[in-house]
Structures are given as C-alpha cells and as structure tokens.
Amino acid sequence: MPHTDEAGKAPRRPTREEIAVVGLVPLLEPFFRGPVVRALMPAQLRDAMETHGLTPRHGAVLPQLLAGEPLSVSEIARRLHVSLPTASELVGGLSRAGIVERTEDPANRRRILVSLAEDFRAPLEDFVARRGEPLLRALDGLSPSERAGFLAGLSAWVHEVQN
C-alpha cells in the first residue's frame, strides 16, 4: 500500500529532481543484501549467525547494543519498531548463539537487560566499521553544513519509514 498522508488519497507525484534522488536508493540495495553482508562480516560473527540460523532481523539488534549501556527488551522493541514478543524472540536467538547476554536489572528484577557478549564486541565493531566505510568516505567529502543536511534528510526519511 503506498504511503499517503490521508487514507485513500494517492501519493503526490515526485518532481524530476525528486525522481533523480529516489532513483539512487535502489543503487544502495545490493550493499545490504546477504552475500555482501556475509563477505564483510568477521568469521566469528558470521559463523555464530549461520550456525544458529539467525537472520538480518537478529543482526539489527546488535548495533543498538554496541553503542552504549545494556538495553531492556522493551527498549529494543521500541528502537526497532517491533512488538515486544518479536524483540524477545530476537534476543532469545542471539542469546542462544552466545552473541548477547541477558541479566536481571538490579533495580527491577522483573526487567531483563540485554548486553553484547564481550567475545563478540570486537568482531561487531569491525563489522560496523567495514559496513560504514563507504558512508564515512562520502561524509568526508562533505562540508559541515552538507553533513548536517545529509543527517537531517536521512533522519527524516527514517522517521517517515518507521511511522
């Protein structure tokens, strides 16, 4: 179903300039496909993912954990825009693979906190660095104001897709 602001209203037709921008998006898609992703993934992480039948949806949890403190399953669900049962299932698979660890929140024993297993921190950091190289090279060529504009546009797009 096309994204519309109002139910039943057809989406607006893009301008020629907008068509040129939208036309760039499919050119990025192969970079996010399985073979390219697997080639960039460190062996330890790739083996754990493949051995335990983990999918890109499981992989989407990992950068969230790399960036900071342990997260609750509810916070993971919120960030990934998935249901709580789905987030719980994703965390369960990652936990069985040994990629993440689950612990009780000392402040609330009913709440489970999820963190990246230390053995997988360095491989995941390497993977994120490899995946980010083309983007970081592109950003290097932009002025600070162009970077700010790029970030604003990308953030707005993510917001639209997720809402």
Regions from the PLM with identified roles:
Residues 2-3, 13-31, 122-163:
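Terminal interaction helix/tail motif
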Residues 6-8, 92-149:
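Charged, amphipathic alpha-helical coiled-coil/dimerization segments
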Residues 15, 55, 84, 117, ...:
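Ser/Thr-centered flexible coil motifs
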Residues 38-83, 97, 113:
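N-terminal helix-turn-helix DNA-binding core of bacterial DNA-binding proteins
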